[in-house]
Amino acid sequence: MGQSPNGCSINNQQGVEFHQGKILFGDKYLKQSDMFTDAPTKLATPNSLLLCVRAPVGVVNITQREICIGRGLCSLKPNAAINLDYAYHALTTYQSDFESKSTGSTFKAISGSIIRNEVFALPPLQEQYRIVTKIEEIFAQLDAIEASL
């Protein structure tokens, strides 16, 4: 789970890139921020999944670089038995589940225990690669159809 650095350490010139929510989430990969901190508190390493834990709950992205994450994000680092792209696609299917488990009156949020207690299907690594290949093939076809409309 993220932890926001001291507000005095936030700047737009130097330090570790800082993200506190999904505002710079791309379709799949995190976009560059112009906010930095010279006192990072919680780091997400390259090739980690970023999960929004505050409204909107359950949105997923991948960071390709080290960043500092605030309280609105959770970083998940797949191990060697988990294909990053498979984990990304699998986690996106849980958004409505995370939303249904969120609590809060001002804005919805999920806790670390909700994430830790979630059960994910984990096929063998080679099957994960086959699943990702098929998903990307289908998405490419959908993109082509959409472009032709």
Q: What are the functions of these language-model segments?
A:
Residues 20-22, 30-92, 102, 111:
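A short beta-sheet element
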Residues 97, 114-149:
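Amphipathic alpha-helical coiled-coil/heptad-repeat segments
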Residues 106:
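Extended, charge-rich, solvent-exposed interface segments
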Residues 3, 26-28, 58-60, 140:
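Flexible loop/turn segments at secondary-structure boundaries
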Residues 1-26, 39:
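Low-complexity, Lys/Gly-biased intrinsically disordered segments
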